[in-house]
Amino acid sequence: MERLDKVLAATGRWSRREVKLLVKQGQVRVNGVAASSAEEKLDPETAAVTVGGQAVVLQKHTYIMLHKPAGVLSATEDNRQKTVLELLPPELRRRGLSPVGRLDKDTEGLLLLTDDGELAHRLLSPKYHVDKRYYAEVDGLLGPADADAFAKGMTLDDGLVCLPAGLELCGSGACIVTLQEGKFHQVKRMLAFRGAPVRYLKRLAMGPLTLDPSLETGAFRDLTAAEVSALRKTAGL
């Protein structure tokens, strides 16, 4: 059993002082009942806690789904350009979050931010066969021969060796690419190699985690307990 203020402060969203104020204001409920004290004891593994009517995921690590906009770097800091961490409030930036994999500056879509280093490593390692799915709009025509080339794996003109990947044609000038690796500019390089340079790219999913369609560009939310569990299962944890 742990104190309520300690558990909520560990999420990185509030300080203990802020938790005490929220409890005093009647904003915090534990298992449906208004908390009477910030020192109240609870089991973070089983307790259902809400703050201001919003469910709070109580867990050791922080997991954030971000709908990355174009024009922002997938980095923790940069002296000249805006990074994805700058899209988060200060209390989350203090959590030591890092992006799981990098989306190019001009690429949009799903980006997982976490302080769970072991999970991040496994999601990115080809050893664990975690699919990353992208939607691309291209200049040029793609056909069954290109899908076959993706399925067999390919070596690009610059020497990059690409593992077998999925290419689903979505009508004129659009496709879905599924990879289990994430080398530098890989989707763009593979499609350009097949004569279809990318003009728009968006990541849709990583393993079982799919971009929430209700998240506007630049918005974020906590992963649900079910989403975290599914990711960890996929990564063999």
Regions found by a protein language model. Give the residues of each.
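Basic, flexible Lys/Arg- and Gly-enriched helix-loop patches that mediate nucleic-acid binding at interfaces
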Residues: 1-237
